[in-house]
C-alpha cells in the first residue's frame, strides 16, 4: 500500500510521508477528538486543490474511544482540508452511525443539538447537524450544498472554522478509494460559499 501511495504521489505532484507522526496537535482542534485521544498518524498524502485554493491531507490515524477498562482502539483514514477563507464551525454526522459504533460526538451546545431544515426534511432525517452559531450555519448551508450532501455517503464532516475534517469511511482507505475522497472534497468545496480570492 505504501508503494502504491508513493507512486500515486509521484504521478500527481503530491507529497507522501509513510513514517509514523506522533505530532497530531492540529487534529485536536476538532471536537471529534475532545474525548478521543489520537495516538498517531501515518501514511500522510498531501497536495493542493488548485481549483478551490485549498491544501488537503489524507492520513491514517489511530485513536482511542471509551473509558480505561473498556478502551477500544480505532484505525481509520481521515481527510483534512484547509480552507481559503473562514466558515462557520459545525459538525455533520450520519444519523445513528456513531450511536452504533461509539459515543455520540460532543455537540456544540445542548440548545443546538440538531439544526433542522424544514424545507429539506430528507437531509435533516439523514444527518445530524450541530454548531455554535445556528444563524450563520443556516445561511451557509445553501440549497445547493444541502442537495450535494444528500446525494453523497457521508459519515462525519466537521468544520473548526478554518478547515474541514472528513471521514468518508470508517476504515483504512484502500489506494483506489483516495481519488474518490479527493473528488468528494473538491466537489464539496465547490458547493460551499467560499471566498477563493
Question: Language-model features: where?
Answer:
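Charged, low-complexity intrinsically disordered regions
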Residues: 3-27, 31-197
Amino acid at each position: 500500500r505504501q508503494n502504491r501511495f508513493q507512486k500515486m504521489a509521484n504521478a500527481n505532484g503530491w507529497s507522501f510521508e509513510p513514517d509514523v507522526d506522533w505530532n497530531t496537535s492540529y487534529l485536536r482542534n476538532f471536537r471529534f477528538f475532545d474525548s478521543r485521544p489520537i495516538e498517531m498518524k501515518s501514511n500522510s498524502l498531501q497536495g493542493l486543490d488548485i481549483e478551490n485554493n485549498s491544501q488537503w491531507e489524507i492520513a491514517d490515524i489511530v485513536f482511542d474511544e471509551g473509558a480505561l477498562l473498556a478502551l477500544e482502539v480505532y484505525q481509520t483514514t481521515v481527510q483534512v482540508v484547509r480552507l481559503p477563507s473562514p466558515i462557520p464551525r459545525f459538525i455533520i454526522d450520519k444519523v445513528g452511525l456513531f450511536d452504533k459504533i461509539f459515543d455520540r460526538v460532543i455537540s456544540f451546545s445542548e440548545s443546538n443539538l440538531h439544526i433542522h431544515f424544514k424545507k429539506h426534511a430528507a437531509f435533516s432525517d439523514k444527518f445530524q447537524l450541530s454548531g455554535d452559531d445556528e444563524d450563520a450555519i443556516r445561511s451557509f448551508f445553501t440549497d445547493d450544498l444541502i442537495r450535494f450532501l444528500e446525494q453523497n455517503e457521508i459519515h462525519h464532516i466537521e468544520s473548526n472554522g478554518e478547515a474541514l475534517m472528513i471521514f468518508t469511511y470508517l476504515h483504512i482507505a484502500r489506494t483506489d478509494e483516495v481519488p474518490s475522497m479527493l473528488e468528494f472534497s473538491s466537489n464539496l468545496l465547490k458547493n460551499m460559499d467560499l471566498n477563493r480570492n
